[in-house]
């Protein structure tokens, strides 16, 4: 059994150079641009998925917020495809890296906050102080609300990292256990393999759900600031 449980989460290196960039670019190949007048099945599915995502995420937004629709849809498709590709055996999942998720979360969060302060400065500042707050609690509540505001991108990144990492780690443990049990107890190995198969199906759903949750929270931050 592999003693290093976190070996699958190490960034792959080729000739001493990390190949993370190539892995991140890879999902874009799954969504080709249409180059024909008549769409094929792949393009039709892509357009249907784009319309469905847009309807779910952008229906509550104002016209200013809907200008973010293309970026939010691209974000969802990127995270979802990255998570799904990470389900392939012996593959690397970039979304298990906290640095990458923080790198996605902070610019998006900062963009929504900057949009709010530019378009609705008074309302954005009012979020830092709930209405009807007693005078002696004002300094404390302003500090608390400010801290909670800056924690949002960190929580966004940690949530995605933790859920994807936990799922892959559990699959790795059960898979290693199944291989060990095959030589000692075939019946128990079949049971653990069945559990692994069910967990794999669940992780495919988690991969899509976490992509949707990440994008939805960014959409909610945008809605609060537009």
From Swiss-Prot:
Q: Which Gene3D superfamilies match?
A: ATP synthase, F0 complex, subunit A
Catalytic activity entry? H(+)(in) = H(+)(out)
Q: Where does it localize?
A: Mitochondrion inner membrane
Q: Which UniProt keywords apply?
A: ATP synthesis, CF(0), Hydrogen ion transport, Ion transport, Membrane, Mitochondrion, Mitochondrion inner membrane, Transmembrane, Transmembrane helix, Transport
Matching entries from PROSITE patterns are given as: ATPASE_A (PS00449)
Bilayer-crossing residues are 5-25, 68-88, 97-117, 136-156, 179-199, 201-221
Its topology with respect to the membrane?
Answer: Multi-pass membrane protein
- Principal location listed in the UniProt entry: mitochondrion
Q: Which GO cellular component terms, listed alphabetically, does the Swiss-Prot or TrEMBL entry include?
A: mitochondrial inner membrane; proton-transporting ATP synthase complex
Q: Name one Pfam family in it.
A: ATP-synt_A
Q: Output the GO biological process annotations, alphabetical, semicolon-separated.
A: proton motive force-driven ATP synthesis; proton transmembrane transport
What GO annotations for molecular function exist for this entry? proton channel activity; proton-transporting ATP synthase activity, rotational mechanism
- Subunit composition? Component of the ATP synthase complex composed at least of ATP5F1A/subunit alpha, ATP5F1B/subunit beta, ATP5MC1/subunit c (homooctomer), MT-ATP6/subunit a, MT-ATP8/subunit 8, ATP5ME/subunit e, ATP5MF/subunit f, ATP5MG/subunit g, ATP5MK/subunit k, ATP5MJ/subunit j, ATP5F1C/subunit gamma, ATP5F1D/subunit delta, ATP5F1E/subunit epsilon, ATP5PF/subunit F6, ATP5PB/subunit b, ATP5PD/subunit d, ATP5PO/subunit OSCP.
- Its biological function? Subunit a, of the mitochondrial membrane ATP synthase complex (F(1)F(0) ATP synthase or Complex V) that produces ATP from ADP in the presence of a proton gradient across the membrane which is generated by electron transport complexes of the respiratory chain. ATP synthase complex consist of a soluble F(1) head domain - the catalytic core - and a membrane F(1) domain - the membrane proton channel. These two domains are linked by a central stalk rotating inside the F(1) region and a stationary peripheral stalk.
Family of the protein in this entry: Belongs to the ATPase A chain family.
Descriptive protein name: ATP synthase F(0) complex subunit a
Species the sequence originates in:
Balaenoptera musculus
Q: Which gene carries the instructions for this protein?
A: MT-ATP6
């Amino acid at each position: 059994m592999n003693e290093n449980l976190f070996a699958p989460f190490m960034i792959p290196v080729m000739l001493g150079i990390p190949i993370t960039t190539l892995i991140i670019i890879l999902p874009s190949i799954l969504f080709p641009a249409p180059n024909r007048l008549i769409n094929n099945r792949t393009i039709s599915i892509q357009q249907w998925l784009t319309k469905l995502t847009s309807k779910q995420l952008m229906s509550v937004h104002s016209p200013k917020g809907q200008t973010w629709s293309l970026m939010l849809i691209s974000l969802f498709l990127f995270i979802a495809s990255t998570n799904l590709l990470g389900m392939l055996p012996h593959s690397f999942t970039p979304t298990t890296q906290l640095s990458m998720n923080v790198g996605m979360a902070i610019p998006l969060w900062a963009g929504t906050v900057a949009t709010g302060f530019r378009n609705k400065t008074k309302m954005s500042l009012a979020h830092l102080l709930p209405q009807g707050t007693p005078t002696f609690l004002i300094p404390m509540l302003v500090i608390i609300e400010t801290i909670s505001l800056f924690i949002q991108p960190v929580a966004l990144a940690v949530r995605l990292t933790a859920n994807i990492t936990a799922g892959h780690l559990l699959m790795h443990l059960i898979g290693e256990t199944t291989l060990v049990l095959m030589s000692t107890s075939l019946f128990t190995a079949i049971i653990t393999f069945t559990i692994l198969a069910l967990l794999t199906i669940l992780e495919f759903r988690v991969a899509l759900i976490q992509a949707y949750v990440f994008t939805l929270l960014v959409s909610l931050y945008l809605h609060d600031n537009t």
